[in-house]
Amino acid sequence: MVEKILIHRILTLFPNAIARKLLLMLTFILIFWIIYLASKDHTKFSFNLENHIILNQGNIFKKYSHSETPLCPAVSPKETELRIKDIMEKLDQQIPPRPFTHVNTTTSATHSTATILNPQDTYCRGDQLDILLEVRDHLGHRKQYGGDFLRARMYSTALMAGASGKVTDFNNGTYLVSFTLFWEGQVSLSLLLIHPSEGVSALWRARNQGCDRIIFTGLFANRSSNVFTECGLTLNTNAELCQYMDDRDQEAFYCVRPQHMPCEALTHMTTRTRNISYLSKEEWRLFHRSNIGVEMMKNFTPIEVIPCNKSENIKKNCQIGMKTPFPSGYTLKKMWITAFCKQIKFNETKNINDCLERKLIYLMGDSTLHQWIYYLQKAVKTLKYFDHHGAGIFKTHVLLDVERHILIQWKKHGHPFVTKKLFSVKDENYIPREIDQVAGDKNTAIVITLGQHFRPFPINIFIRRAINIQKAIERLFLRSPETKVILKTENTREIEQNAEMFSDFHGYIQNLIIRDIFVDLNVGIIDAWDMTIAYCTNNAHPPDYVIQNQIGMFLNYIC
Protein backbone atom coordinates (compact mmCIF):
# COMPACT_ATOMS: atom_id res chain seq x y z
CA MET A 1 0.00 0.00 0.00
CA VAL A 2 2.81 2.38 0.96
CA GLU A 3 4.67 1.50 -2.22
CA LYS A 4 1.58 2.31 -4.43
CA ILE A 5 1.01 5.73 -2.84
CA LEU A 6 4.70 6.57 -3.20
CA ILE A 7 4.70 5.56 -6.92
CA HIS A 8 1.48 7.53 -7.66
CA ARG A 9 2.94 10.73 -6.17
CA ILE A 10 6.17 10.37 -8.15
CA LEU A 11 4.32 9.79 -11.47
CA THR A 12 2.25 12.98 -11.12
CA LEU A 13 5.52 14.94 -11.22
CA PHE A 14 6.30 13.57 -14.73
CA PRO A 15 3.50 14.12 -17.34
CA ASN A 16 5.64 12.75 -20.26
CA ALA A 17 4.63 9.07 -20.88
CA ILE A 18 8.08 7.74 -21.84
CA ALA A 19 9.75 9.43 -18.91
CA ARG A 20 7.06 8.09 -16.64
CA LYS A 21 7.67 4.49 -17.86
CA LEU A 22 11.43 4.76 -17.36
CA LEU A 23 10.98 6.24 -13.91
CA LEU A 24 8.51 3.51 -13.00
CA MET A 25 11.04 0.81 -13.93
CA LEU A 26 13.82 2.47 -11.93
CA THR A 27 11.52 2.85 -8.90
CA PHE A 28 10.57 -0.86 -8.92
CA ILE A 29 14.24 -1.85 -9.26
CA LEU A 30 15.17 0.39 -6.31
CA ILE A 31 12.36 -0.97 -4.10
CA PHE A 32 13.28 -4.62 -4.82
CA TRP A 33 16.96 -3.87 -4.14
CA ILE A 34 16.11 -2.36 -0.73
CA ILE A 35 13.90 -5.36 0.18
CA TYR A 36 16.69 -7.76 -0.89
CA LEU A 37 19.34 -6.03 1.23
CA ALA A 38 17.03 -5.85 4.22
CA SER A 39 16.17 -9.55 4.05
CA LYS A 40 19.85 -10.49 3.69
CA ASP A 41 20.90 -8.47 6.77
CA HIS A 42 18.00 -9.89 8.76
CA THR A 43 19.03 -13.43 7.88
CA LYS A 44 22.62 -12.65 8.80
CA PHE A 45 21.60 -11.13 12.17
CA SER A 46 19.28 -14.05 12.96
CA PHE A 47 22.02 -16.57 12.19
CA ASN A 48 24.55 -14.82 14.40
CA LEU A 49 22.17 -14.69 17.36
CA GLU A 50 21.11 -18.32 17.01
CA ASN A 51 24.71 -19.40 16.58
CA HIS A 52 25.72 -17.47 19.73
CA ILE A 53 23.01 -19.22 21.77
CA ILE A 54 23.99 -22.65 20.45
CA LEU A 55 27.66 -22.07 21.29
CA ASN A 56 26.83 -20.93 24.80
CA GLN A 57 24.60 -23.95 25.37
CA GLY A 58 27.45 -26.14 24.18
CA ASN A 59 29.86 -24.54 26.69
CA ILE A 60 27.47 -25.03 29.59
CA PHE A 61 26.98 -28.68 28.66
CA LYS A 62 30.73 -29.09 28.41
CA LYS A 63 31.30 -27.70 31.89
CA TYR A 64 28.70 -29.88 33.54
CA SER A 65 29.53 -33.01 31.59
CA HIS A 66 33.30 -32.98 31.79
CA SER A 67 33.95 -30.48 34.61
CA GLU A 68 36.89 -29.00 32.72
CA THR A 69 36.49 -25.54 34.26
CA PRO A 70 35.15 -24.61 37.71
CA LEU A 71 32.15 -22.28 37.46
CA CYS A 72 33.06 -20.01 40.39
CA PRO A 73 36.59 -20.75 41.57
CA ALA A 74 37.28 -19.26 45.00
CA VAL A 75 40.96 -19.23 44.17
CA SER A 76 42.65 -19.85 40.86
CA PRO A 77 44.64 -23.08 40.51
CA LYS A 78 47.67 -20.96 39.66
CA GLU A 79 47.38 -19.01 42.91
CA THR A 80 47.03 -22.21 44.92
CA GLU A 81 50.07 -23.76 43.22
CA LEU A 82 52.13 -20.65 44.01
CA ARG A 83 51.11 -20.80 47.68
CA ILE A 84 51.98 -24.49 47.89
CA LYS A 85 55.35 -23.84 46.26
CA ASP A 86 56.08 -20.95 48.64
CA ILE A 87 55.28 -23.02 51.75
CA MET A 88 57.32 -25.97 50.43
CA GLU A 89 60.33 -23.73 49.81
CA LYS A 90 60.16 -22.32 53.35
CA LEU A 91 59.98 -25.83 54.80
CA ASP A 92 62.89 -27.03 52.66
CA GLN A 93 64.97 -24.17 54.09
CA GLN A 94 64.03 -25.17 57.65
CA ILE A 95 64.81 -28.86 57.00
CA PRO A 96 68.01 -28.92 54.91
CA PRO A 97 69.60 -32.21 53.78
CA ARG A 98 71.85 -33.79 56.47
CA PRO A 99 73.48 -36.82 54.83
CA PHE A 100 75.56 -39.09 57.07
CA THR A 101 77.63 -42.22 56.63
CA HIS A 102 77.45 -43.63 60.16
CA VAL A 103 75.13 -43.33 63.17
CA ASN A 104 78.13 -42.23 65.27
CA THR A 105 78.08 -38.80 63.59
CA THR A 106 74.41 -38.17 64.48
CA THR A 107 73.11 -36.47 67.63
CA SER A 108 73.59 -38.43 70.85
CA ALA A 109 71.31 -37.91 73.86
CA THR A 110 73.98 -39.38 76.16
CA HIS A 111 76.84 -37.12 75.04
CA SER A 112 74.80 -33.91 74.82
CA THR A 113 74.76 -31.58 77.85
CA ALA A 114 71.87 -29.64 79.39
CA THR A 115 72.54 -26.81 81.88
CA ILE A 116 70.01 -24.85 83.95
CA LEU A 117 70.63 -21.13 83.53
CA ASN A 118 70.65 -19.10 86.78
CA PRO A 119 69.92 -22.13 89.03
CA GLN A 120 68.13 -21.52 92.35
CA ASP A 121 67.19 -23.56 95.41
CA THR A 122 63.53 -22.69 94.92
CA TYR A 123 61.51 -21.08 92.16
CA CYS A 124 58.35 -19.00 92.23
CA ARG A 125 55.13 -20.12 90.62
CA GLY A 126 54.82 -18.31 87.28
CA ASP A 127 58.59 -17.97 86.78
CA GLN A 128 60.33 -19.09 83.61
CA LEU A 129 63.05 -21.72 83.91
CA ASP A 130 65.60 -21.77 81.07
CA ILE A 131 67.94 -24.60 80.09
CA LEU A 132 70.80 -24.41 77.60
CA LEU A 133 71.27 -27.58 75.55
CA GLU A 134 74.50 -28.26 73.66
CA VAL A 135 74.28 -31.28 71.38
CA ARG A 136 77.12 -33.66 70.50
CA ASP A 137 77.40 -36.75 68.36
CA HIS A 138 78.14 -40.29 69.58
CA LEU A 139 81.88 -39.58 69.34
CA GLY A 140 81.54 -36.58 71.67
CA HIS A 141 82.08 -33.95 68.97
CA ARG A 142 80.11 -30.67 69.21
CA LYS A 143 77.59 -30.37 66.42
CA GLN A 144 77.61 -27.19 64.36
CA TYR A 145 74.00 -27.26 63.17
CA GLY A 146 70.53 -27.76 64.67
CA GLY A 147 67.37 -29.36 63.36
CA ASP A 148 66.94 -32.07 66.03
CA PHE A 149 63.33 -32.96 66.84
CA LEU A 150 63.04 -32.49 70.61
CA ARG A 151 60.13 -32.72 73.04
CA ALA A 152 60.29 -30.82 76.34
CA ARG A 153 57.89 -31.52 79.21
CA MET A 154 57.62 -30.73 82.92
CA TYR A 155 55.48 -32.85 85.22
CA SER A 156 54.50 -33.74 88.78
CA THR A 157 53.25 -37.32 88.97
CA ALA A 158 51.65 -36.92 92.41
CA LEU A 159 49.63 -33.91 91.24
CA MET A 160 48.76 -35.49 87.87
CA ALA A 161 50.22 -32.30 86.39
CA GLY A 162 52.09 -31.68 83.16
CA ALA A 163 52.99 -28.99 80.63
CA SER A 164 54.97 -28.61 77.42
CA GLY A 165 58.26 -26.77 77.27
CA LYS A 166 59.25 -24.43 74.47
CA VAL A 167 62.35 -25.26 72.40
CA THR A 168 64.26 -22.53 70.53
CA ASP A 169 66.77 -23.77 67.93
CA PHE A 170 69.76 -21.47 67.31
CA ASN A 171 70.79 -23.62 64.32
CA ASN A 172 74.36 -23.97 65.60
CA GLY A 173 74.08 -27.05 67.82
CA THR A 174 72.65 -25.15 70.81
CA TYR A 175 69.05 -24.87 71.99
CA LEU A 176 67.19 -22.88 74.63
CA VAL A 177 64.53 -24.90 76.44
CA SER A 178 62.05 -22.78 78.41
CA PHE A 179 59.50 -23.93 81.00
CA THR A 180 56.76 -21.79 82.56
CA LEU A 181 56.35 -22.97 86.16
CA PHE A 182 52.56 -23.18 86.26
CA TRP A 183 52.04 -24.96 89.62
CA GLU A 184 53.60 -25.38 93.06
CA GLY A 185 55.43 -28.41 94.43
CA GLN A 186 58.13 -30.72 93.19
CA VAL A 187 58.49 -30.50 89.42
CA SER A 188 60.46 -32.91 87.22
CA LEU A 189 61.91 -31.92 83.86
CA SER A 190 62.15 -34.02 80.72
CA LEU A 191 63.77 -33.41 77.36
CA LEU A 192 63.44 -36.18 74.79
CA LEU A 193 65.47 -36.56 71.63
CA ILE A 194 62.71 -37.87 69.37
CA HIS A 195 64.86 -37.81 66.21
CA PRO A 196 68.33 -36.40 65.50
CA SER A 197 68.55 -33.79 62.74
CA GLU A 198 69.90 -36.45 60.38
CA GLY A 199 66.78 -38.55 60.98
CA VAL A 200 64.54 -35.51 60.51
CA SER A 201 66.19 -34.79 57.16
CA ALA A 202 65.76 -38.43 56.08
CA LEU A 203 62.06 -38.43 57.05
CA TRP A 204 61.45 -35.21 55.13
CA ARG A 205 63.15 -36.52 52.00
CA ALA A 206 61.40 -39.90 52.17
CA ARG A 207 57.96 -38.40 52.78
CA ASN A 208 58.03 -36.30 49.63
CA GLN A 209 59.17 -39.08 47.29
CA GLY A 210 55.86 -40.78 46.61
CA CYS A 211 52.28 -41.76 47.46
CA ASP A 212 52.76 -45.51 47.13
CA ARG A 213 53.41 -46.52 50.75
CA ILE A 214 49.65 -46.95 51.28
CA ILE A 215 47.57 -49.29 49.08
CA PHE A 216 43.93 -48.26 48.57
CA THR A 217 41.54 -51.00 47.50
CA GLY A 218 38.14 -49.99 46.14
CA LEU A 219 35.01 -52.15 46.12
CA PHE A 220 32.82 -51.80 43.03
CA ALA A 221 29.30 -53.23 43.35
CA ASN A 222 26.99 -53.94 40.40
CA ARG A 223 23.91 -56.04 41.13
CA SER A 224 25.21 -59.34 42.50
CA SER A 225 28.79 -58.78 41.36
CA ASN A 226 31.52 -57.26 43.56
CA VAL A 227 34.97 -56.40 42.22
CA PHE A 228 38.02 -55.06 44.11
CA THR A 229 40.53 -52.87 42.27
CA GLU A 230 43.53 -50.76 43.21
CA CYS A 231 42.94 -47.07 43.91
CA GLY A 232 45.07 -44.14 45.01
CA LEU A 233 45.95 -40.46 44.91
CA THR A 234 48.12 -41.40 41.93
CA LEU A 235 48.31 -44.68 40.01
CA ASN A 236 51.22 -45.82 37.85
CA THR A 237 49.41 -48.08 35.40
CA ASN A 238 48.33 -48.29 31.76
CA ALA A 239 44.94 -49.71 32.74
CA GLU A 240 41.77 -47.70 32.18
CA LEU A 241 41.12 -45.48 35.19
CA CYS A 242 38.12 -44.02 36.94
CA GLN A 243 38.94 -40.41 37.79
CA TYR A 244 37.18 -38.83 40.76
CA MET A 245 38.00 -35.15 40.31
CA ASP A 246 37.26 -31.93 42.14
CA ASP A 247 38.32 -29.41 39.52
CA ARG A 248 37.68 -26.30 41.57
CA ASP A 249 39.94 -27.41 44.42
CA GLN A 250 42.33 -29.45 42.23
CA GLU A 251 41.79 -32.64 44.26
CA ALA A 252 42.01 -36.03 42.55
CA PHE A 253 41.54 -39.72 43.34
CA TYR A 254 41.79 -42.67 40.96
CA CYS A 255 40.75 -46.31 40.73
CA VAL A 256 41.47 -48.96 38.13
CA ARG A 257 38.18 -49.34 36.30
CA PRO A 258 36.73 -52.85 36.51
CA GLN A 259 35.48 -54.40 33.28
CA HIS A 260 31.79 -53.95 32.47
CA MET A 261 31.21 -51.64 35.45
CA PRO A 262 30.65 -47.89 35.61
CA CYS A 263 32.90 -45.71 37.76
CA GLU A 264 29.83 -44.78 39.83
CA ALA A 265 29.72 -48.38 41.11
CA LEU A 266 32.52 -47.62 43.61
CA THR A 267 30.95 -48.02 47.07
CA HIS A 268 33.63 -48.87 49.66
CA MET A 269 37.33 -48.54 50.36
CA THR A 270 39.98 -50.10 52.54
CA THR A 271 43.73 -49.56 52.90
CA ARG A 272 46.87 -51.37 53.94
CA THR A 273 50.56 -50.50 54.04
CA ARG A 274 52.86 -51.51 51.22
CA ASN A 275 56.24 -53.06 52.01
CA ILE A 276 58.21 -50.15 50.58
CA SER A 277 60.61 -47.62 52.09
CA TYR A 278 62.55 -44.61 50.86
CA LEU A 279 65.02 -44.81 53.76
CA SER A 280 68.42 -46.48 53.50
CA LYS A 281 69.42 -49.28 55.89
CA GLU A 282 71.74 -46.89 57.72
CA GLU A 283 68.94 -44.33 58.08
CA TRP A 284 66.55 -46.98 59.40
CA ARG A 285 68.89 -47.56 62.35
CA LEU A 286 67.92 -44.10 63.63
CA PHE A 287 64.30 -45.24 63.87
CA HIS A 288 64.74 -48.37 65.95
CA ARG A 289 62.57 -47.96 69.04
CA SER A 290 65.64 -47.70 71.30
CA ASN A 291 66.78 -44.63 69.34
CA ILE A 292 63.47 -42.73 69.44
CA GLY A 293 62.46 -40.54 72.39
CA VAL A 294 65.72 -40.88 74.36
CA GLU A 295 65.91 -38.83 77.58
CA MET A 296 68.54 -36.07 77.56
CA MET A 297 68.07 -34.97 81.22
CA LYS A 298 68.34 -38.30 83.06
CA ASN A 299 70.40 -37.02 85.98
CA PHE A 300 68.32 -33.93 86.82
CA THR A 301 66.71 -33.83 90.25
CA PRO A 302 63.24 -32.27 90.61
CA ILE A 303 63.04 -28.54 91.32
CA GLU A 304 60.97 -26.93 94.09
CA VAL A 305 58.30 -24.38 93.14
CA ILE A 306 56.64 -22.21 95.83
CA PRO A 307 53.79 -19.63 95.68
CA CYS A 308 55.84 -16.45 96.44
CA ASN A 309 52.49 -14.62 96.87
CA LYS A 310 52.52 -13.62 93.22
CA SER A 311 49.24 -12.19 91.97
CA GLU A 312 47.76 -13.86 88.91
CA ASN A 313 46.98 -11.89 85.79
CA ILE A 314 43.26 -11.35 85.21
CA LYS A 315 42.30 -13.22 82.05
CA LYS A 316 39.39 -12.62 79.70
CA ASN A 317 36.87 -15.39 79.07
CA CYS A 318 37.89 -17.78 76.30
CA GLN A 319 36.55 -16.71 72.94
CA ILE A 320 37.08 -17.40 69.28
CA GLY A 321 39.82 -15.39 67.62
CA MET A 322 42.20 -15.39 70.60
CA LYS A 323 45.81 -16.15 69.73
CA THR A 324 47.09 -19.26 71.49
CA PRO A 325 50.65 -19.15 72.86
CA PHE A 326 52.86 -22.20 73.34
CA PRO A 327 52.46 -23.70 75.79
CA SER A 328 48.76 -22.83 75.74
CA GLY A 329 48.06 -24.35 79.16
CA TYR A 330 48.81 -27.18 81.57
CA THR A 331 47.17 -30.13 83.29
CA LEU A 332 46.53 -30.31 87.03
CA LYS A 333 44.65 -33.21 88.62
CA LYS A 334 43.87 -34.30 85.06
CA MET A 335 42.08 -31.02 84.30
CA TRP A 336 43.28 -28.78 81.46
CA ILE A 337 43.85 -25.16 82.52
CA THR A 338 44.43 -22.63 79.75
CA ALA A 339 47.22 -20.07 80.06
CA PHE A 340 45.63 -17.38 77.89
CA CYS A 341 41.94 -17.19 78.85
CA LYS A 342 39.48 -17.83 81.67
CA GLN A 343 37.53 -21.08 81.40
CA ILE A 344 34.02 -22.00 82.45
CA LYS A 345 33.74 -25.50 83.91
CA PHE A 346 31.28 -27.81 82.13
CA ASN A 347 31.18 -30.67 84.62
CA GLU A 348 27.43 -31.31 84.80
CA THR A 349 25.00 -32.55 82.17
CA LYS A 350 22.74 -29.53 82.73
CA ASN A 351 25.58 -27.10 82.01
CA ILE A 352 26.46 -28.95 78.82
CA ASN A 353 22.81 -29.13 77.70
CA ASP A 354 22.30 -25.43 78.37
CA CYS A 355 25.33 -24.67 76.21
CA LEU A 356 24.32 -27.01 73.39
CA GLU A 357 20.63 -26.05 73.27
CA ARG A 358 19.47 -25.12 69.73
CA LYS A 359 22.97 -25.74 68.39
CA LEU A 360 23.91 -27.39 65.10
CA ILE A 361 27.41 -28.82 65.46
CA TYR A 362 29.35 -30.31 62.56
CA LEU A 363 32.47 -32.33 63.35
CA MET A 364 34.61 -32.81 60.24
CA GLY A 365 37.76 -34.87 60.28
CA ASP A 366 39.27 -38.13 61.45
CA SER A 367 38.68 -40.66 64.23
CA THR A 368 40.27 -38.38 66.86
CA LEU A 369 37.21 -36.16 66.42
CA HIS A 370 34.97 -39.22 66.19
CA GLN A 371 35.96 -39.81 69.84
CA TRP A 372 34.00 -36.68 70.75
CA ILE A 373 30.77 -38.33 69.56
CA TYR A 374 31.38 -41.41 71.71
CA TYR A 375 32.24 -39.32 74.75
CA LEU A 376 29.22 -36.99 74.41
CA GLN A 377 26.90 -39.97 73.98
CA LYS A 378 28.13 -41.37 77.32
CA ALA A 379 28.32 -38.05 79.17
CA VAL A 380 25.01 -36.51 78.03
CA LYS A 381 22.25 -39.11 78.28
CA THR A 382 19.69 -36.91 76.50
CA LEU A 383 21.70 -37.12 73.27
CA LYS A 384 20.39 -40.08 71.28
CA TYR A 385 22.19 -41.87 68.48
CA PHE A 386 20.50 -41.65 65.07
CA ASP A 387 21.24 -44.76 63.00
CA HIS A 388 22.39 -43.87 59.48
CA HIS A 389 22.44 -47.56 58.59
CA GLY A 390 25.44 -48.51 56.49
CA ALA A 391 28.37 -50.64 57.56
CA GLY A 392 31.47 -49.91 59.60
CA ILE A 393 32.37 -47.47 62.35
CA PHE A 394 33.31 -44.65 59.97
CA LYS A 395 29.84 -43.96 58.60
CA THR A 396 28.24 -40.58 59.29
CA HIS A 397 27.43 -40.44 63.01
CA VAL A 398 24.63 -38.24 64.37
CA LEU A 399 23.48 -37.44 67.91
CA LEU A 400 20.09 -35.77 68.42
CA ASP A 401 18.21 -34.16 71.28
CA VAL A 402 14.84 -33.36 69.71
CA GLU A 403 13.47 -31.63 72.81
CA ARG A 404 16.38 -29.17 72.99
CA HIS A 405 16.88 -28.96 69.20
CA ILE A 406 20.49 -30.19 69.34
CA LEU A 407 22.22 -31.88 66.41
CA ILE A 408 25.82 -33.11 66.51
CA GLN A 409 27.16 -34.74 63.35
CA TRP A 410 30.53 -36.33 62.60
CA LYS A 411 31.70 -37.05 59.05
CA LYS A 412 35.10 -38.34 58.04
CA HIS A 413 37.22 -36.22 55.75
CA GLY A 414 37.82 -37.18 52.12
CA HIS A 415 40.81 -39.07 50.71
CA PRO A 416 43.28 -39.99 52.01
CA PHE A 417 41.61 -41.92 54.84
CA VAL A 418 43.90 -44.72 56.06
CA THR A 419 42.32 -47.72 57.80
CA LYS A 420 42.17 -51.49 57.40
CA LYS A 421 38.43 -51.33 58.11
CA LEU A 422 36.10 -51.20 55.11
CA PHE A 423 34.37 -47.81 54.88
CA SER A 424 31.75 -46.34 52.56
CA VAL A 425 32.69 -43.63 50.08
CA LYS A 426 29.09 -42.85 49.11
CA ASP A 427 28.56 -40.30 51.89
CA GLU A 428 32.14 -39.05 51.66
CA ASN A 429 33.17 -35.53 50.70
CA TYR A 430 36.15 -33.24 51.00
CA ILE A 431 35.87 -30.87 53.97
CA PRO A 432 35.71 -27.70 51.79
CA ARG A 433 32.63 -29.11 50.04
CA GLU A 434 31.05 -30.01 53.40
CA ILE A 435 31.64 -26.45 54.65
CA ASP A 436 30.05 -25.08 51.46
CA GLN A 437 26.86 -26.99 52.31
CA VAL A 438 26.51 -25.37 55.75
CA ALA A 439 24.23 -22.32 55.72
CA GLY A 440 25.55 -21.12 59.07
CA ASP A 441 24.20 -18.82 61.78
CA LYS A 442 25.00 -17.82 65.37
CA ASN A 443 23.90 -21.26 66.62
CA THR A 444 26.05 -23.22 64.17
CA ALA A 445 29.54 -24.46 65.01
CA ILE A 446 32.03 -26.38 62.89
CA VAL A 447 35.00 -28.29 64.31
CA ILE A 448 37.75 -29.40 61.92
CA THR A 449 40.74 -31.66 62.45
CA LEU A 450 43.14 -32.86 59.81
CA GLY A 451 46.50 -34.57 59.77
CA GLN A 452 46.89 -38.16 61.02
CA HIS A 453 45.82 -39.74 57.72
CA PHE A 454 48.03 -37.37 55.69
CA ARG A 455 51.31 -38.29 57.40
CA PRO A 456 52.26 -41.12 54.96
CA PHE A 457 51.84 -38.83 51.91
CA PRO A 458 53.83 -35.96 50.37
CA ILE A 459 53.31 -32.71 52.25
CA ASN A 460 51.93 -30.84 49.23
CA ILE A 461 48.72 -32.92 49.50
CA PHE A 462 48.18 -31.71 53.06
CA ILE A 463 49.02 -28.09 52.16
CA ARG A 464 46.53 -28.10 49.27
CA ARG A 465 43.75 -29.45 51.50
CA ALA A 466 44.48 -26.89 54.22
CA ILE A 467 44.38 -24.02 51.69
CA ASN A 468 41.09 -25.31 50.26
CA ILE A 469 39.60 -25.47 53.77
CA GLN A 470 40.80 -21.93 54.47
CA LYS A 471 39.03 -20.70 51.31
CA ALA A 472 35.85 -22.56 52.24
CA ILE A 473 35.86 -20.93 55.69
CA GLU A 474 36.29 -17.51 54.06
CA ARG A 475 33.26 -18.22 51.85
CA LEU A 476 31.31 -19.33 54.94
CA PHE A 477 32.17 -16.12 56.81
CA LEU A 478 30.98 -14.03 53.84
CA ARG A 479 27.50 -15.56 54.02
CA SER A 480 27.42 -16.09 57.79
CA PRO A 481 30.08 -14.27 59.86
CA GLU A 482 28.39 -15.42 63.10
CA THR A 483 29.12 -19.10 62.47
CA LYS A 484 31.76 -20.42 64.86
CA VAL A 485 34.69 -22.38 63.45
CA ILE A 486 37.16 -24.23 65.68
CA LEU A 487 40.32 -26.04 64.59
CA LYS A 488 41.56 -28.98 66.66
CA THR A 489 45.24 -29.64 66.05
CA GLU A 490 46.63 -33.17 65.82
CA ASN A 491 47.18 -35.42 68.81
CA THR A 492 50.63 -36.87 69.38
CA ARG A 493 50.64 -40.61 68.75
CA GLU A 494 52.36 -43.92 69.50
CA ILE A 495 56.15 -43.90 69.24
CA GLU A 496 56.19 -47.60 68.30
CA GLN A 497 54.45 -46.99 64.97
CA ASN A 498 56.31 -47.02 61.64
CA ALA A 499 58.31 -43.78 61.97
CA GLU A 500 58.76 -43.27 58.24
CA MET A 501 55.00 -42.94 57.76
CA PHE A 502 53.58 -41.94 61.14
CA SER A 503 56.27 -40.11 63.13
CA ASP A 504 55.11 -37.16 65.21
CA PHE A 505 57.63 -35.11 63.26
CA HIS A 506 55.17 -35.20 60.35
CA GLY A 507 52.41 -34.03 62.68
CA TYR A 508 54.62 -31.25 64.04
CA ILE A 509 55.26 -29.91 60.52
CA GLN A 510 51.54 -30.12 59.68
CA ASN A 511 50.77 -28.21 62.88
CA LEU A 512 53.10 -25.40 61.75
CA ILE A 513 51.41 -25.34 58.33
CA ILE A 514 47.91 -25.13 59.84
CA ARG A 515 48.90 -22.22 62.07
CA ASP A 516 50.49 -20.41 59.14
CA ILE A 517 47.56 -20.84 56.73
CA PHE A 518 44.81 -20.00 59.24
CA VAL A 519 46.65 -17.20 61.07
CA ASP A 520 44.37 -14.41 59.80
CA LEU A 521 41.04 -16.22 60.18
CA ASN A 522 38.69 -15.58 63.10
CA VAL A 523 38.71 -19.17 64.37
CA GLY A 524 39.22 -20.88 67.71
CA ILE A 525 42.16 -23.22 68.31
CA ILE A 526 42.01 -26.33 70.48
CA ASP A 527 45.69 -27.15 70.86
CA ALA A 528 45.42 -30.93 71.12
CA TRP A 529 49.12 -31.18 70.25
CA ASP A 530 50.05 -29.21 73.38
CA MET A 531 47.45 -31.06 75.48
CA THR A 532 48.61 -34.54 74.55
CA ILE A 533 52.26 -33.64 75.24
CA ALA A 534 51.25 -32.27 78.64
CA TYR A 535 49.23 -35.42 79.41
CA CYS A 536 52.02 -37.61 77.93
CA THR A 537 49.47 -39.87 76.27
CA ASN A 538 51.56 -41.00 73.25
CA ASN A 539 48.36 -42.33 71.69
CA ALA A 540 46.54 -41.13 68.57
CA HIS A 541 43.33 -41.87 70.49
CA PRO A 542 43.90 -40.52 74.01
CA PRO A 543 41.79 -41.59 77.02
CA ASP A 544 38.42 -40.06 77.92
CA TYR A 545 39.77 -37.51 80.40
CA VAL A 546 41.73 -35.89 77.56
CA ILE A 547 38.67 -35.93 75.26
CA GLN A 548 36.61 -34.38 78.08
CA ASN A 549 39.03 -31.46 78.29
CA GLN A 550 39.13 -30.99 74.52
CA ILE A 551 35.33 -30.80 74.48
CA GLY A 552 35.42 -28.47 77.50
CA MET A 553 37.60 -26.07 75.50
CA PHE A 554 35.15 -26.30 72.59
CA LEU A 555 32.18 -25.47 74.84
CA ASN A 556 34.05 -22.43 76.16
CA TYR A 557 34.42 -21.17 72.60
CA ILE A 558 30.75 -21.53 71.61
CA CYS A 559 28.96 -20.51 74.87
UniProtKB/Swiss-Prot annotation:
Record's GO cellular component terms: membrane
Claim: Transmembrane is one of the keywords in the record: yes
Cell location: Membrane
Membrane topology: Single-pass membrane protein
TM helices/strands, residue ranges: 17-37
Primary localisation category: membrane
Pfam families in alphabetical order: Neurexophilin, NXPE4_C
UniProt keyword list: Membrane, Transmembrane, Transmembrane helix
InterPro entries to which the protein is assigned, alphabetical: Ig_E-set (IPR014756), NXPE4_C (IPR057106), NXPH/NXPE (IPR026845)
Entry annotated with the keyword Acyltransferase: no
Membership in a protein family: Belongs to the NXPE family.
Stated name of the protein: NXPE family member 2
